[in-house]
């Protein structure tokens, strides 16, 4: 995919800043393609661990998508003052199953927000990108007639 032309006022974030924003975000969106080829989005709380995103889950849609090996994405965003930002991690996910890696996750304080058994750990690795931009007032989007006969 080719890079889009720069947009005035949009700051492309460096990798360090992207990881810091991922660390600070209380939750993110895990994006997968299900078995029927449809996109699905799951809000999850997470932790940054060893250059990856880690979250807990139970058996079900997220774990099935991970097992399929399809590409995934993980997205966080926010607003700070008059600046908005977005960070996306695009890559692959795997269920943490090796004993050494499972023991290592014990040091990551990651308690699921939703009740129920969330005994599975998923790790997402990939390419990171992010951007920050000024929040535009709603008046910018006001659209009037473009000329005679144009819809209002």
Where are these regions (language model features)?
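Short gly/pro-enriched beta-turn/loop segments at secondary-structure junctions
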Residues: 23-26, 41, 117-119, 126
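A short local loop/turn or secondary-structure capping micro-motif enriched for an aromatic residue
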Residues: 49-51, 62-65, 140-142
């Amino acid at each position: 995919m080719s890079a889009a032309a720069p947009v005035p006022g949009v700051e492309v974030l460096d990798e360090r800043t992207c990881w810091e924003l991922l660390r600070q975000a209380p939750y993110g969106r895990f994006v997968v393609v299900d078995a029927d080829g449809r996109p699905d989005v799951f809000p999850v709380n997470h932790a940054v661990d060893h250059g990856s995103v880690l979250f807990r889950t139970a058996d079900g849609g997220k774990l099935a998508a991970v097992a399929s090996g399809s590409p995934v994405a993980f997205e966080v965003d926010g607003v700070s003052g008059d600046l908005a930002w977005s960070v996306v991690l695009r890559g692959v996910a795997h269920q943490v199953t090796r004993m050494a890696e499972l023991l290592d996750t014990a040091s990551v304080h990651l308690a699921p927000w939703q009740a129920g058994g969330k005994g599975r750990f998923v790790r997402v690795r990939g390419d990171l990108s992010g951007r920050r931009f000024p929040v535009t007032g709603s008046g910018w989007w006001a659209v009037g007639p473009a000329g005679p006969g144009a819809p209002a």
